[in-house]
Amino acid sequence: MISHLLAAGFSGAIRALTGARALWRCAPSADHRVYYGNHVSHGDFVMIWSALPPALRRDVRPVAGAEYWQRDALRRYLIREVFNGVLIERDPAQRKRDAIETLCEAVDGGSSLILFPEGTRNQSDEPLLPFKSGLYHLAHCRPELEFVPVWIDNLARVMPKGKLLPLPLLCTATFGDTLRLGADEGKEAFLARARAALLALSENGAGGAA
């Protein structure tokens, strides 16, 4: 009960601090989905999670780096009890099991996921880094999954590196059309298509913001 109240409080706080709004090009759905977005800050998954309709949030789990979220008791509580995150070790040598198996287990348990296929926060001048292969491997293992690109705009300026408090600016999470792995689609083709779909939602992409 306390965790649910905290989750609702976090969602409200994020919307108040960032002026967050969600723009949907696909219809919100309780179907198993993977929401994948651009990665500019540790607040990214909270932004996407907060932008989802309340009825969907309980079944949507963020995929997060274990080394960051297990540093202290508060972070461990938040990621486990409030956000119900799926923790992945970034260093393969530290992993006790395959990361894709862990994600498939979460999906098989009835969850949708939030993840960031760039693999690390983008601190470059490029709008989007190349995608890691994990997005394809998850799609290959569970081809029935729908993948939803989500472009987060302005969060890097709301939560700038080195600042203790967020700066109030308007943030937008734009949810694009769903896509699935094609029957004969290879890794490079799928990753390129998924990346292009996400980039098209940005102000710098071909499609522009919704």
Task: List each language-model region with its residue ranges.
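Helix-to-loop junction immediately C-terminal to a conserved catalytic motif
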Residues: 2-41
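Short, flexible loop segments at the rims of nucleotide/cofactor-binding pockets, characterized by
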Residues: 10-18, 90-94, 125-126
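Catalytic core of membrane glycerolipid acyltransferases/transacylases, capturing the structured
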Residues: 29-92
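Short coil/turn segments at beta-strand junctions that form active-site/ligand-binding loops
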Residues: 31-32, 58, 109-111, 145
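Short, well-ordered beta-to-alpha junction loops that form the rim of enzyme active sites
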Residues: 38, 117-119, 152
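N-terminal/domain-start segments enriched in small and hydrophobic, helix-friendly residues
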Residues: 50, 96-128, 172-208
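Hydrophobic/aromatic ligand-binding patch that stacks against planar heteroaromatic rings
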Residues: 78-79, 105, 137-141
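A cross-family acyltransferase "interaction/gating" segment
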Residues: 112, 123-186
